[in-house]
């Protein structure tokens, strides 16, 4: 319901997110310098809607401006933007003259959409896999050695001397 949406948005914005969110929202001057750091924006013909500021403007700023009073259709679209158009890499923060962490802002959108049950199913499944197995492939701890040995054998067709060190003290790990 729209009441549930409003309550959820306001709880996350006012209770969970706090001062950091407020500082970022009040500091951003919408200059667009963050855009040059966003690979998604750059790879989509520099569409302004896909710039970091554009994504936040279409999602979080609307929620703030409307004090949480947004439609379910709006929230569905916000979930798509937050889950598929930003991978939270934080490159935009490196380009922002004020150091605004747009990834944090988009993670707030993800949190809200998650609480409303709007996170895309494949992302929910991946998150569940991580919480259960600590990886996205449902590989259980006792299956890791066999899995890594299999990957090592497969990769040797391209890199003949490849070795994945298991239980080797001081091994370089990527």
Regions found by a protein language model. Name each.
Residues 2-30, 35-75:
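N-terminal cysteine/histidine-rich coordination modules
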Residues 16-18, 22-25, 57-174:
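Iron-sulfur-cluster electron-transfer modules
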């Amino acid at each position: 319901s729209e009441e549930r949406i409003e309550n959820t948005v306001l709880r996350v914005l006012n209770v969970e997110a706090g001062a950091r969110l407020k500082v970022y929202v009040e500091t951003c001057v919408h200059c667009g310098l963050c855009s040059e750091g966003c690979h998604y924006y750059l790879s989509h013909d520099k569409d302004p809607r896909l710039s970091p500021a554009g994504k936040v403007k279409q999602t979080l700023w609307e929620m703030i401006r409307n004090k949480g009073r947004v439609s379910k259709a709006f929230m569905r679209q916000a979930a798509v933007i937050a889950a598929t158009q930003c991978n939270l890499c934080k490159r935009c923060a490196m380009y922002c003259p004020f150091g605004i962490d747009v990834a944090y802002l988009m993670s707030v959108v993800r949190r809200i959409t998650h609480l409303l049950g709007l996170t895309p199913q494949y992302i929910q499944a991946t998150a569940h896999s991580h919480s259960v197995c600590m990886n996205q492939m449902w590989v259980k701890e006792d299956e890791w050695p066999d899995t890594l040995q299999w990957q090592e054998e497969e990769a040797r067709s391209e890199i003949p001397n490849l070795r994945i060190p298991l239980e080797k003290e001081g091994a370089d790990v990527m």
